């Protein structure tokens, strides 16, 4: 499939501003209004010209901070900000970049707890293609983690490498159907109905395939997690393109 023909979604974690303020920034960019959705994730959203919702949600994994002069200090959970895009097309990458620039100007920054998750439409991937993707990732994972400088905390908990027992069984049984592959992924149980099934916390997340129809890549840091904590719009474009290849 041509890279420009693929749908994607992106989730970008950050702090430094509140969810309410982040939603205002997004609404200002689109020329629409901020809306409060509430719920478990205390979410806000703003619609674009196509009436697609760009959500701002709370995420429990984010260490919340705000600026106090030149210092960064602890902040309450209002500063837990995860930007969740609607289903996007290749042309929307520029929109994602502009939103990140606007949020950064408004005070958003990142720290080592913040990551980026990118979803690619799984519809074109049958079981053999998914197996091939798993093997490619397994062969390149160490290099990818080094290149992306994946934080050790995220690697150990939220962005684990491919499980060796899963990989061995996958290549031994060589599934030809999604159902067979699902059985291997969940080791005989069907966890696809659980949103927070533990198997989702891998760099290459196939739980997302069975739960929502997307392949999720979770290896990316939100930006420069050093003292500046900058969010890089250019890197985000490169990450999206990497997942589409």
Where are these regions (language model features)?
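Short, conserved phosphate-binding/catalytic loop or strand-edge motifs used
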Residues: 112-116, 120
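C-terminal accessory/tail domains of diverse enzymes
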Residues: 1-109, 123-245
């Amino acid at each position: 499939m041509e890279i420009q023909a693929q749908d994607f979604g992106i989730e970008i974690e950050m702090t430094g501003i509140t969810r309410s303020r982040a939603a205002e920034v997004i609404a200002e960019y689109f020329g629409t209004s901020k809306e409060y959705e509430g719920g478990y994730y205390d979410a806000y959203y703003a619609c674009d010209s196509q009436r697609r919702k760009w959500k701002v949600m709370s995420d429990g994994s984010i260490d919340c901070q705000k600026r106090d002069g030149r210092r960064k200090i602890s902040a309450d959970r209002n500063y837990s900000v995860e930007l969740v895009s609607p289903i996007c097309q290749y042309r929307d990458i520029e929109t994602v970049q502009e939103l990140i620039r606007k949020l950064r100007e408004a005070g958003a920054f990142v720290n080592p707890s913040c990551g980026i998750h990118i979803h690619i439409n799984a519809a074109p991937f049958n079981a053999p293609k998914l197996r091939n993707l798993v093997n490619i990732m397994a062969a390149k994972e160490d290099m990818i983690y080094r290149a992306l400088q994946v934080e050790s905390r995220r690697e150990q908990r939220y962005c684990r490498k491919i499980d060796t027992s899963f990989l061995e069984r996958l290549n031994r049984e060589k599934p030809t159907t999604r159902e067979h592959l699902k059985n291997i992924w969940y080791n005989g149980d069907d966890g696809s109905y659980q949103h927070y099934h533990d198997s989702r916390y891998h760099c290459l997340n196939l739980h997302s395939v069975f739960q929502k129809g997307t392949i999720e890549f979770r290896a990316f840091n939100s930006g420069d997690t050093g003292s500046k904590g900058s969010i890089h719009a250019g890197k985000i474009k490169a990450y999206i393109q990497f997942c589409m290849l």
